[in-house]
Regions:
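Non-heme di-metal
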Residues: 1-327
C-alpha cells in the first residue's frame, strides 16, 4: 500500500503483536522439552478442534474440522510414543488424562498430493460470525504447530525423532492449506484486518474466562484489552479506506459462545468409529475404498513412504498398549 497512515498503523500494531507473542511464549516452562511442548500443542489442537466443530454451523467446514481432528489425534499418539522412547516420560501425566492418547487416522496415510488439499470455500456474507472466528482460530493454531515442529527438528540427535518432527510438520502444512482454502477469497484486506483483531480479542477473552491461575488470567485480560483497541482502530481504518461500516461486516457482533478447552472423549470416540477411513476427493470426504485408482494422493503417498514412515516406525518400536488412555 502507498497509504502512509495505514503503513504506520500496521507497523505499530505488528510490534505490539510481537510483544504479545513473546509474553505468551514465556509462559512455557524453561525445563519443558520440545517433545513435551509438541504433546501439549497436539492436545490443545485436538480439544480446540473438537470444540470448534461442535460449535460450527457450516456443515462442510465442520466436516473439515472433524477430518483434521483425527489426524492431529494420531500426531498426539505418535509424539507420546516417541516421548516414552526418547525421554522415558508418560504423556498421560502431561495431558492429565483429559484427552485420549490413541491412534487416529494413521500419519502414514495422511500424506496427500497438494491438489487434494483444495477445498470449496464458504462465503463471507453467508456464514455466522462464529464461523469466521472458528476459521481464523484454527488457521492460527495449525500455523503455530507447523512452525514449531520445523524448528524442533534440530533439537534431537536421534534420526527417528528428527524425521518424526519433519513428517508431522509436513502434515500440519497440509492442514494449513486446507483451512486457508476454506476462507472466502473475496475478503478485502480491511475486512480481514477487522476480523483478525476481533478474533484475537475473542480468543483472549475465551482464555480469560477459562483460566484459573490469577496471574495468567490477568495477562489474558491485558492482552484482550490491547486487541480490543486494535479492533477499534481497524474498524476506523476500514471505514476510512473502504468506506465500509463495521455493521455491514459484523452485524450485531454477537458471538453466541466462547471457545472452551475441555475433555471431548465421547465426541472423539464417535469420530473414530465412523470417520477414520475418510479421505478428501472432489470436494467431499469419502471412504478410501471408494476413491478412484488414479487419486493423486495414492502415488504421492507411496513415494513419501518409500523409506518408511517415521510415525509407523515409532509404533513398531513401542506397542500402543504402553500408552495410557483415559478411563
Amino acid at each position: 500500500t502507498d497509504d502512509d497512515a495505514l503503513k504506520k498503523h500496521l507497523a505499530i500494531v505488528r510490534r505490539a503483536e510481537s510483544l504479545q507473542h513473546q509474553a505468551v511464549s514465556s509462559l512455557i516452562p524453561a525445563d519443558e522439552t520440545p517433545l513435551e511442548t509438541a504433546i501439549g500443542l497436539e492436545q490443545m489442537v485436538v480439544d480446540l478442534t473438537a470444540d470448534l466443530a461442535q460449535n460450527e454451523a457450516d456443515d462442510y467446514f465442520k466436516q473439515a474440522l472433524d477430518f483434521a481432528l483425527l489426524e492431529d489425534l494420531d500426531h498426539l499418539f505418535r509424539f507420546s510414543l516417541m516421548y516414552r522412547m526418547v525421554e522415558g516420560g508418560d504423556a498421560g501425566w502431561l495431558t492429565r488424562d483429559r484427552t485420549p492418547i490413541v491412534a487416529g487416522r494413521p500419519t502414514s496415510a495422511q500424506h496427500r498430493h497438494p491438489v487434494d488439499e483444495l477445498r470449496p470455500h464458504f462465503d463471507l456474507d453467508e456464514v455466522p460470525l462464529r464461523t469466521l472466528m472458528n476459521h481464523l482460530t484454527i488457521v492460527s493454531a495449525e500455523q503455530e504447530k507447523m512452525l514449531f515442529y520445523k524448528s524442533s527438528i534440530r533439537a534431537y540427535p536421534e534420526e527417528l525423532t528428527r524425521r518424526l518432527f519433519g513428517e508431522i510438520a509436513m502434515v500440519e502444512e497440509q492442514h494449513l492449506s486446507q483451512y486457508e482454502d476454506l476462507g472466502d477469497p473475496h475478503t478485502t484486506p480491511m475486512e480481514l484486518l477487522v476480523l483478525m483483531e476481533l478474533n484475537e480479542a475473542y480468543n483472549y477473552f475465551s482464555a480469560f474466562k477459562g483460566e484459573s491461575d490469577p496471574a495468567i488470567r490477568t495477562l489474558w485480560s491485558e492482552l484482550m484489552e490491547q486487541e480490543l483497541e486494535h479492533f477499534h482502530l481497524a474498524v476506523a481504518l476500514m471505514e476510512r479506506i473502504e468506506g465500509r461500516d463495521a455493521h455491514e461486516l459484523l452485524g450485531d457482533a454477537m458471538i453466541p459462545s466462547l471457545i472452551e478447552l475441555k475433555p471431548n472423549i465421547g465426541y472423539i470416540e464417535a469420530l473414530l468409529s465412523t470417520q477414520v477411513n475418510l479421505q478428501p476427493f472432489d470436494g467431499e470426504f469419502i471412504p478410501e475404498s471408494r476413491l478412484p485408482a488414479d487419486w493423486p494422493s495414492f502415488s504421492f503417498r507411496e513415494r513419501m513412504n518409500s523409506r518408511g514412515s517415521p510415525a509407523d516406525e515409532v509404533e513398531k518400536r513401542r506397542p500402543r498398549e504402553r500408552i495410557r488412555r483415559p478411563a
